[in-house]
Amino acid sequence: MRKNAIAYDQLYALLRPAVWHKTVLEVATGTGQVAKHLLCSADHIEATDSSAAMIAQAKRGNFSSKRHFSVQDMFHLPYADQSFDVVIVSNALHIVPHPEKALIEFRRVLKNDGTLISPTFTHAENSPWGNLQALALKIAGFPLHSRWTSAAYLAFLQQNGWTVCKSVVLQNSIPLTYAECKKVERR
């Protein structure tokens, strides 16, 4: 599991400068680990998840006015248009049905010059150990709806109206493709 810890340290190192002094929406926060690691970098973090149990766990030890946790549906966010400088959706697009619909909602709440950051497990490149972990995730209630290679995932983002400005594949037991994106202007 040391490999996973190294990959997550690399992920946080990539995220910190991208959220520096920004207003951030994190979707699918789970237990809030990303939001907790970015607290010193961002001006404010609105961290959401569809699971009340996950949000309850994330709120434990949350003593900062810079961070707020709430239960929200990523397909129907309650925020005004262009509310956030950065939207982060980490390790979630591969487990939700119709991830392209979530991208439409992220576009709506993201400022025109904002950044979507979407690190996602790219299961199609799994090792046998990674395949076993993917099976364990499915059994735990996180079924794979999309199984991408890194290249296919980046193409998916581009096909759905995003310009990928930066991408890195982090070596994890399941490869983690980090993508920073900007909105493509609609005509």
Label every PLM stretch briefly.
Residues 1-12:
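Conserved SAM-binding loop and adjacent beta-strand
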Residues 25-27, 31-76:
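Class I SAM-dependent methyltransferase SAM/SAH-binding core
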Residues 75-86:
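A short acidic, Gly/Pro-enriched loop at the edge of an enzyme's catalytic core
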Residues 86-98:
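A short SAM/SAH-binding and catalytic strip from SAM-dependent methyltransferases
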Residues 100-112:
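A short glycine-rich, Lys/Arg-flanked "PGG" loop and its adjoining helix->strand segment in the class I
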Residues 117-140:
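Conserved class I S-adenosyl-L-methionine
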Residues 145-160:
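Short alpha-helix
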Residues 160-162, 166-187:
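Core SAM-dependent methyltransferase catalytic element
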